[in-house]
């Protein structure tokens, strides 16, 4: 073999033809480390950056791939493309050195002494990762004594991330920040409009928001031209009537004696307060709760604990804590009553005022609850006293279907018109019906099952009422199982009939129905699905976050009241157990309602 001449060795065995890629994991880090060492020793560098008369050597290629600013400078025919020294006019040496060091090392030391220089330079050179790190640093530094300065910094450099963070900070602490002279003097008009219109602004009440807007307008005469734009964000309907009339209007008149447009906003709210019963059908952007969250509420019922009878408690489910919290009390204890939501208000109607429910103690009372002020008012009573009936929201009205009272089972149906606070009869049911269940599905009223007399088996029937087509009840496909004292729910494209009880035909002995069936109006078919975990006649039901909640109830076989919560997930087609109720209870009502959000629930993170 000749010296220095390579030869190919013959293979004794054939190698595999399959390929494999090997990765040098540290190659990029080693490359940058090597380039940085060259730069520190002044080796292989082909450009010098000058700032504050100090020089920083670098590699054009690395600058170009790391910064759109340098990429354009070195490739678009600018004179700097061929210069060995480039002066960065207006840039500080502290900022340039920190950013260039960052491009080579990936490390960006930040502190109160260099942050302004680094941010300015990183923004100039369009090194956006460095800009983002500056924003992260500044977010940790936001306090009540510097947030306005940092907001101006964010606006100056178009730092959307920092700007949004400061907005959340201001919204969370609005009650304390907005009354300071610094805020009233320096906050920009478009920012204040955004805060006053926000669903997340944290403030004790709407009158305080008006006070902030009013004081901001008074700061400078030139601000008055923005009065309508600013005050349009105040929800005057949430301010008490007496304050609107004796505080808000006089102050507006003194500030804007010739203006009429702003006064119209207040007069609209005064009219809203005067039409008390019509408020549910007068809802607009300026009447709704700010930042409300949907909550599951449990109202009333019959309690099995010794010494207790009917409950007037209204509790809401704290999902995070997994417990029920009392919010208020109904005007009177009730069970077997019905509730519905219209225009953000709870209506509770009828029910029994005695544990001995049989119709003799049926009520005709209607009450309305306003979550904005935790306040109950009385509405016009129903034309007939009702217990064991159905109440639903139908457009801008409520509909009460069937039930019973001291005269016996009912077939009558009546509709409540909140605009003028009165009830009118509509088409009655084809049979006396009580102990049935109902739901509203895509604007149509459905009721199923129930009883017509004191004895005998329960019914399979399902009826529908569509006021848009005719004032009449129509027969639908009957349920697979007869049942009464059950629950119904509408969720997406299906209607559910849940639990209840029935009587054996031969012995008239009551038994629990755990089966659950789902109805598809498109195919007109019922399908059996996963049964309940345990019996639940006379339970409360509501739909929250695409899940069906069945609360409490009664077992006719064991004669026990339930304290449990059963939750149905339609995606998994299964029932799970939720947080226990405060007490063992049957005959409650449940509803989901938009409630005020707790101040501490808003986070700036």
UniProtKB/Swiss-Prot annotation:
Keywords: Kelch repeat, Repeat, Ubl conjugation pathway. SMART domains: BACK, BTB, Kelch. Pfam families: BACK (PF07707), BTB (PF00651), Kelch_1 (PF01344), Kelch_KLHDC2_KLHL20_DRC7 (PF24681). Kelch repeats lie at residues 295-344, 346-396, 397-443, 445-493, 494-546, 547-595. GO terms for biological process: protein ubiquitination. It comes from the Eukaryota. Residues 147-248 form the BACK domain. Residues 45-112 form the BTB domain. One of its GO terms (molecular function) is cullin family protein binding. Transmembrane segments: none annotated. Pathway: Protein modification; protein ubiquitination. Gene3D superfamilies: 1.25.40.420, Kelch-type beta propeller (2.120.10.80), Potassium Channel Kv1.1, Chain A (3.30.710.10). Probable substrate-specific adapter of an E3 ubiquitin-protein ligase complex which mediates the ubiquitination and subsequent proteasomal degradation of target proteins. This is Kelch-like protein 36.
């Amino acid at each position: 073999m000749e010296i220095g001449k390579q030869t190919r060795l013959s293979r004794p065995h054939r190698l595999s033809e399959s390929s494999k890629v090997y990765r040098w994991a540290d190659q990029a880090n080693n490359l940058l480390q090597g380039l940085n060492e060259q730069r520190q020793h002044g080796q292989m560098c082909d450009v010098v950056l000058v700032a504050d008369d100090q020089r920083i050597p670098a590699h054009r290629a690395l600058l170009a791939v790391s910064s759109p600013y340098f990429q354009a400078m070195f490739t678009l025919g600018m004179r700097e493309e061929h210069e060995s020294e480039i002066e960065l006019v207006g840039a500080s040496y502290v900022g340039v050195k920190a950013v260039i060091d960052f491009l080579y090392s990936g490390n960006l030391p930040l502190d109160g002494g260099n942050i302004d220089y680094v941010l300015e330079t990183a923004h100039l050179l369009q090194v956006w990762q460095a800009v983002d790190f500056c924003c992260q640093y500044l977010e940790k530094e936001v306090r009540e004594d510097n947030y306005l300065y940092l907001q101006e910094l964010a606006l100056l450099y178009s730092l959307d991330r920092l700007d949004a963070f400061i907005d959340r900070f201001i919204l969370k602490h609005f009650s304390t920040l907005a009354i300071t002279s610094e805020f009233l003097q320096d906050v920009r008009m478009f920012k204040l409009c955004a805060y006053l219109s926000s669903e997340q602004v944290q403030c004790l009440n709407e009158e305080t928001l008006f006070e902030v807007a009013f004081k901001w307008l008074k700061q400078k005469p030139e601000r008055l031209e923005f009065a309508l734009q600013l005050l349009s964000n105040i929800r005057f309907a949430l301010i008490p009537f007496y304050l609107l009339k004796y505080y808000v209007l006089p102050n507006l008149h003194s500030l804007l004696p010739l203006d009429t447009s702003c006064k119209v906003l207040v007069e609209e709210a005064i009219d809203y307060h005067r039409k008390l019963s019509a408020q549910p059908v007068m809802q607009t952007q300026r009447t709704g709760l700010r930042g409300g969250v949907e909550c599951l509420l449990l109202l009333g019922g019959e309690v099995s604990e010794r010494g207790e009878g009917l409950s007037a408690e209204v509790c809401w489910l704290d999902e995070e804590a997994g417990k029920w919290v009392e919010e208020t009390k109904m005007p009177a204890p009730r069970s077997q009553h019905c509730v519905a939501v219209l225009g953000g208000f709870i209506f509770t109607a009828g029910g029994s005022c005695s544990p001995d429910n049989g119709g003799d103690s049926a009520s005709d009372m209607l009450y309305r609850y306003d979550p904005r002020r935790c306040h109950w008012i009385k509405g016009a009573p129903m034309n007939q006293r009702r217990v064991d009936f159905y109440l639903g929201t139908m457009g801008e009205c409520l509909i009460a279907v069937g039930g019973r009272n001291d005269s016996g089972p009912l077939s009558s149906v009546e509709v409540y018109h909140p605009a003028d606070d009165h009830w009118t009869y509509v088409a009655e049911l084809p049979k006396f019906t009580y102990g049935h269940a109902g739901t509203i599905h895509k604007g149509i009223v459905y009721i199923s099952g129930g009883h017509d007399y004191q004895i005998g088996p329960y019914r399979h029937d399902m009826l529908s009422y569509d006021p848009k087509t005719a004032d009449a009840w129509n027969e639908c496909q009957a349920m697979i199982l007869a049942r009464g004292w059950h629950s119904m729910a509408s969720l997406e494209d299906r209607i559910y009939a849940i639990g209840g009880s029935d009587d054996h035909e031969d012995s008239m002995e009551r038994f629990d129905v755990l089966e659950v069936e789902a109805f598809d109006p498109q195919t007109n078919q019922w399908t059996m699905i996963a049964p309940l975990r345990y019996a639940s006649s006379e339970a409360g039901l509501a739909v929250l976050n695409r899940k069906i909640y069945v609360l409490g109830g009664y077992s006719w076989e064991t004669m026990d009241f339930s304290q449990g919560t059963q939750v149905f997930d339609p995606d998994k087609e299964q029932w799970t157990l939720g947080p226990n109720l405060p007490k063992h209870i049957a005959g409650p009502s449940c509803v989901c309602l938009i409630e005020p959000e707790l101040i501490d629930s808003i986070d700036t993170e």
